Curated annotation (Swiss-Prot):
<feature type="compositionally biased region" description="Low complexity">
    <location>
        <begin position="22"/>
        <end position="48"/>
    </location>
</feature>
<dbReference type="GO" id="GO:0030430">
    <property type="term" value="C:host cell cytoplasm"/>
</dbReference>
<feature type="region of interest" description="Interaction with target proteins">
    <location>
        <begin position="1"/>
        <end position="248"/>
    </location>
</feature>
<feature type="repeat" description="LRR 1">
    <location>
        <begin position="104"/>
        <end position="125"/>
    </location>
</feature>
<feature type="compositionally biased region" description="Basic and acidic residues">
    <location>
        <begin position="58"/>
        <end position="67"/>
    </location>
</feature>
<feature type="active site" description="Glycyl thioester intermediate">
    <location>
        <position position="338"/>
    </location>
</feature>
<feature type="repeat" description="LRR 4">
    <location>
        <begin position="167"/>
        <end position="186"/>
    </location>
</feature>
<dbReference type="InterPro" id="IPR029487">
    <property type="entry name" value="NEL_dom"/>
</dbReference>
<dbReference type="GO" id="GO:0016567">
    <property type="term" value="P:protein ubiquitination"/>
</dbReference>
<keyword id="KW-0833">Ubl conjugation pathway</keyword>
<keyword id="KW-1035">Host cytoplasm</keyword>
<feature type="domain" description="NEL">
    <location>
        <begin position="257"/>
        <end position="546"/>
    </location>
</feature>
<dbReference type="InterPro" id="IPR032675">
    <property type="entry name" value="LRR_dom_sf"/>
</dbReference>
<comment type="similarity">
    <text>Belongs to the LRR-containing bacterial E3 ligase family.</text>
</comment>
<keyword id="KW-0808">Transferase</keyword>
<feature type="region of interest" description="Linker">
    <location>
        <begin position="249"/>
        <end position="256"/>
    </location>
</feature>
<feature type="repeat" description="LRR 3">
    <location>
        <begin position="145"/>
        <end position="166"/>
    </location>
</feature>
C-alpha cells in the first residue's frame, strides 16, 4: 500500500521569469522556496490523515533524498543570520542541488550526497565549497574569490580552467583526473590529486608555486621518467618550488663522500675541506654527510645567512672533536624522515654549537652576551614544553588526527624566531600549513614564554643551566669554591632540621616515602637560595643584574 506524499510546490516560485526577485539565486526566491516547502510539509501531514492516494512519479518530485531536512537546515541558517557560518547540507542523499543558493553565501558544505553536478551559477561571494563524496562528473565555473575547494571522491576527469586566482586549498584526490590545469593559482598552498589517472604534469608546475606549497600526486600512473625529472628538480641546489609527493615514494639520494658534500658548503675553502677528508672514518660521518646533502634541499637553502651559518658550523667542528661528535650523533637517522626533521635537527646542532662556545670560554669576557644566550636556551626549553602540550592536546581532541610532533615543534621555533630572538635557528620550514599551529597559538606561546622568563629565568641560570656554573668556576673561582662549601654545610644540619620539622608538621615522622619527597623539595630550595645568592654576587661585581 502506497501513501501519497504531495510534491513540494516549487513551480509558482518562478512564475515571472522577468522578475529580478525570481532568480534562483536571489534572497527573495530562496525565501519563497523555503516558505513553499514549509507549506508542503503541512499539506503532507494533513493529507496523510485523511486520504490514501498514489505515490508521486519521478517527474513529480524534483529530487531524491531528504529534501525536508535540507529545507530545515536552510531555514535555520537564514534565521541565524551569520553569513560566516557554513550552510551544511551534507549527508542528505540529495541528487540534484535544487535549493536556490542565497547570494551572500560564503561557505557551503554538500559533502556525502549523491550529486551528479552542481548549479551552473554559484554565489559570487562563495569562499569555501565542500563537495566531496558525491557523483560529480564536472564542475561549473567557480567564483573568482573561492579560497577552498574540496571535491575528493567524485568522478571528475578534469578541473575547470582557469581555477580561481584566490584558491589556497584544493582537494581533488580519488577522482578520474587525466590532467591538471596548465595554470595553477599562485596562492595555492595545497593541491591534493592522489589516486587519479594522471600521466603527466604541466611543464611549469614547479615554477608556478613557491616553497610553502605542497602537491600530492601519489597513486597516479606517472611514468618513471616524469617522476625522475621532478625529483631531480626538487633536489637541485637553490630549488624554491613546492614539495611534491610522488608514487615512487621518498627518493634516496646517492651517498657521497663526506669531503665532497662539505665542499658544496665551503666553496673555495680548500684547507677546511681537506681537513674534513680526514674525518671520513669517524663514527657517524657517513650519516652526517648524507644529512648535509639533504640540508641543501630544504626550504632554507636559498637564504644566504643560513648557508653562512652552516659553513661556520663546519669550520668550528674541524678543531673541536666533541662538537663534531655531537653533530655526527644528531645526524644519525635524521635523514630518514621529512625535510622539516632535517631542519629541526640542524637547529639542535646550532644549539650544541652555542653551548660549546659558552663552555669553551668564548663569552667569559662578555657576561652580557652569555646571559642573552642563556635566555635563548630558557626560551627554547619553554617552547618545547608548550609544543609538547600542544601535541597532547591535539591528540586528545582528535585521536585519529595525523599529528606530526616534528612540525609542531618546528612551527613554534620558526614562527617565534624573531619575537623571542632565536636567531641561531633556521628561519623557515616547509610544512607550516600542516603543523596545526595557529597564529593564536603562536601569540599565546610568546606571552607564556615571556611570563615564564620573568618569573623563573634567574633560578634557571643559577640551578639548571650547567654552562653558567662552568663559566663561574673560571671567572670567579673563589666565589664558586665558597658556594660549594655552603652547599655541603647546608646539606648537613640545616637539611636534617628542616626535614624533621616538615615531617612532624604533616604527621609523617618516620615515613620513608615522605622523607624522599620532602627531602628533594628541601634540597632544591637550599640549592636555589645558595646558588642564586652567589650568582647575583658575581654579576653585581661586574655591574650586571638579571
Amino acid at each position: 500500500m502506497n501513501v501519497q506524499r504531495p510534491g513540494l510546490a516549487v513551480g509558482p516560485l518562478f512564475e515571472n521569469p522577468e522578475s529580478e526577485s525570481s532568480e534562483p539565486g536571489s534572497p527573495a526566491a530562496a525565501a519563497r522556496w523555503v516558505e513553499a516547502s514549509t507549506e508542503a510539509e503541512a499539506s503532507a501531514a494533513s493529507s496523510s490523515q485523511g486520504q490514501i492516494v498514489a505515490a508521486p512519479t519521478a517527474e513529480e518530485r524534483p529530487w531524491e533524498g531528504r529534501p525536508q531536512e535540507a529545507v530545515s537546515r536552510t531555514r535555520a541558517w537564514r534565521e541565524a543570520g551569520d553569513v560566516d557560518e557554513p550552510l551544511d547540507l551534507s549527508f542528505l542523499s540529495l541528487t540534484p542541488l535544487s535549493i536556490p543558493l542565497v547570494s551572500g553565501l560564503r561557505r557551503l558544505n554538500v559533502n556525502n550526497n549523491q550529486l551528479g553536478d552542481l548549479p551552473d551559477t554559484l554565489p559570487g561571494t562563495l569562499l569555501e565549497l565542500e563537495a566531496s563524496e558525491n557523483r560529480l562528473t564536472r564542475l561549473p565555473d567557480l567564483p573568482a574569490g573561492l579560497q577552498r575547494l574540496n571535491v575528493e571522491n567524485n568522478r571528475l576527469t578534469n578541473l575547470p580552467e582557469p581555477l580561481p586566482a584566490a584558491l589556497e586549498w584544493l582537494g581533488a584526490g580519488y577522482n578520474q583526473l587525466t590532467r591538471l590545469p596548465e595554470m595553477i593559482p599562485p596562492e595555492l598552498i595545497w593541491l591534493g590529486a592522489r589516486n587519479n589517472q594522471l600521466t603527466s604534469v604541466p611543464e611549469s608546475l614547479l615554477t608556478q608555486l613557491g616553497q610553502w606549497s605542497s602537491i600530492d600526486l601519489e597513486n597516479n600512473p606517472l611514468p618513471h621518467g616524469v617522476q625522475t625529472n621532478l625529483v631531480t628538480a626538487m633536489h637541485a641546489a637553490g630549488y624554491a618550488g613546492p614539495q611534491i609527493f610522488l608514487p615512487m615514494g621518498p627518493v634516496e639520494l646517492a651517498r657521497r663522500p663526506l669531503h665532497e658534500v662539505v665542499a658544496d658548503w665551503l666553496e673555495g675553502d680548500l684547507e677546511t675541506v681537506a681537513a674534513w677528508r680526514g674525518f671520513a672514518n669517524e663514527q657517524g660521518a657517513r650519516d652526517y654527510a648524507h644529512f648535509l646533502d639533504r640540508l641543501r634541499t630544504t626550504v632554507n637553502y636559498g637564504n644566504d645567512a643560513f648557508r653562512q651559518a652552516v659553513a661556520i658550523g663546519l669550520r668550528q667542528a674541524v678543531a673541536r672533536p666533541q662538537l663534531r661528535a655531537q653533530y655526527f650523533e644528531q645526524a644519525s637517522g635524521a635523514s630518514d624522515s621529512c625535510e622539516d626533521r632535517i631542519t629541526l635537527t640542524w637547529n639542535g646542532m646550532q644549539t650544541a654549537l652555542l653551548i660549546a662556545d659558552v663552555e669553551d670560554g668564548v663569552y667569559d669576557g662578555s657576561l652580557h652576551q652569555l646571559l642573552q644566550h642563556g635566555r635563548v636556551m630558557f626560551r627554547l626549553e619553554a617552547l618545547d614544553g608548550i609544543a609538547r602540550e600542544t601535541v597532547n592536546s591535539l591528540r586528545r581532541t582528535d585521536p585519529d588526527a595525523d599529528i606530526d610532533e616534528i612540525e609542531v615543534y618546528l612551527a613554534y621555533q620558526t614562527q617565534l624566531r624573531d619575537t623571542l630572538e632565536l636567531r641561531h635557528v633556521a628561519p623557515d620550514m616547509r610544512f607550516l600549513n600542516v603543523s596545526h599551529v595557529t597564529e593564536e597559538d603562536v601569540a599565546r606561546a610568546a606571552s607564556s614564554v615571556r611570563e615564564l622568563e620573568a618569573r623563573g629565568f634567574g633560578e634557571y641560570v643559577a640551578t639548571r643551566w650547567q654552562p653558567w656554573e662552568r663559566v663561574m668556576r673560571r671567572i670567579a673561582p673563589a666565589s664558586h669554591a665558597a658556594m660549594q662549601e655552603q652547599l655541603i654545610e647546608a646539606m648537613g644540619e640545616e637539611f636534617r632540621s628542616r626535614l624533621d620539622e616538615k615531617l612532624a608538621e604533616h604527621g609523617l615522622t618516620g615515613d620513608a616515602d615522605a622523607e624522599r619527597v620532602f627531602g628533594a623539595e628541601i634540597l632544591n630550595d637550599i640549592a636555589r637560595r645558595i646558588k642564586g645568592e652567589t650568582m647575583e654576587k658575581v654579576l653585581r661585581g661586574r655591574g650586571l643584574e638579571l
